[in-house]
Amino acid sequence: MARFFQPKKKTQLETKHQSVLVERMDHNGAGIAYQKNKPVFIDGALPGEKVVIQLTESKSKFSRAKLIKLLQPSELRLKPFCKHFNQCGGCHLQHLGYSSQVEHKSQSLTHLMSKYQTANTEVALPIVGDESGYRRRARISLFVDKKTQLLQFGFRKKQSKQIENITDCAVLDPRLNVLLPKLKSLLNTFSSLTSLGHVELVLGDTGPVMVLRHLKPLVEKDEQALMTLMTLAKEEGATLYSMPETDKLVRLVGDAPSYSETGVTLPFEPNHFIQVNQKVNQQMVAQAIEWLEPQADERVLDLFCGLGNFSLPIAQQSAFVVGVEGVDEMVQQATANAALNQLSNTEFYQANLEEDLSSQLWAKEKFDKVLLDPARAGASGIVDQISALGAKRVVYVSCNPATLARDSESLEKQGYQLAKLGMLDMFPHTSHLESMALFIKA
């Protein structure tokens, strides 16, 4: 007997306004209320608040809702300091006092890692920096408005591909922030606006760095606009690059950028990864060294080493450091950085850290200690191989507590115990949190 496809009936979404009591916050900073034991996630709502909501999504196990009105605001609620707060997708916790943000993130981390904590696990004090003006890096999106034919200049709106026009960002370092209105005005003088891709801003010790990504070669009549941009860079003591292709940078004005970290100098290209928050990064590196306790006669392995942000400061402690990174260009830069700082007790290798490493020459050696600093996806490809490397101590620096928790299970199975755990607030006023965990072989 033939069966005919019958589409499932769509659940009728209840769109009328409802009042609810917010009981807690989730790890992403959304308020959680309950209706018939089903959680309702409400962006912008705080625990203890009575709010009016409108459902925007209803699933079998949860719902999402839009905050319509505050009936009873929390005493922890503050007026956001940025006029773009409700539109820009960058910050989403400015309505919560900063100390409460730090407390919430710390609690979220310990909750996610509770399975691996013992009575002996030490929870370190959170590492924090400045509440505003902390970002030393930003990518400015560019888009031509079809109606006005003017360049839209700013950041993506919340849950949208549209751009919120911004010429003043409170979390951007003031030395970069001051460039925004000047750049927007100048870029609008280009005749071929649709050929402009984005602007990358980075701050090094040598000053601001500006990168203009253009999708097509600039036409001849835009040469004058480019010359004006070069003049602006000189006036601001900035370095200016053009980026005609994804992997090609052309330095037009200024010196090659670098930053200093715990006594070492790290030159970098503006397309290289560096931590956004310099003050938190400095404390993070210092804490990693303190937890690792590198000794002069030990071998330390730094996985996902990048430019040498951890490797070179550790090498200054006289330990022999082997850094491994997936991107060959970064390996070359780390090697050059070690030579610049006269650190001969280092070696750097390129390797795919998602594959079996037993065939790698460097992996055939034993290591006393290991540091991992993976991307958000975590270190699932290599974490199962840590014990085979012989490490007694492992410091795991994570930008995603969910993958840290997942990888902790593997380390626990290999005989490591969670000795220390700490939260690092690299991105104030967002729900993103960095963390550091120390595992010691039992």
UniProtKB/Swiss-Prot annotation:
S-adenosyl-L-methionine binds at residues 275, 304, 309, 325, 352, 373. Its EC number is 2.1.1.190. It is an enzyme of class 2 (transferase). It catalyses: uridine(1939) in 23S rRNA + S-adenosyl-L-methionine = 5-methyluridine(1939) in 23S rRNA + S-adenosyl-L-homocysteine + H(+). GO terms for molecular function: 4 iron, 4 sulfur cluster binding; iron ion binding; RNA binding; rRNA (uridine-C5-)-methyltransferase activity. GO terms for biological process: rRNA base methylation. Gene3D superfamilies: 2.40.50.1070, Nucleic acid-binding proteins, Vaccinia Virus protein VP39. Keywords: 4Fe-4S, Iron, Iron-sulfur, Metal-binding, Methyltransferase, rRNA processing, S-adenosyl-L-methionine, Transferase. Belongs to the class I-like SAM-binding methyltransferase superfamily. RNA M5U methyltransferase family. RlmD subfamily. This is 23S rRNA (uracil(1939)-C(5))-methyltransferase RlmD. It comes from Vibrio atlanticus (strain LGP32). The gene is rlmD.
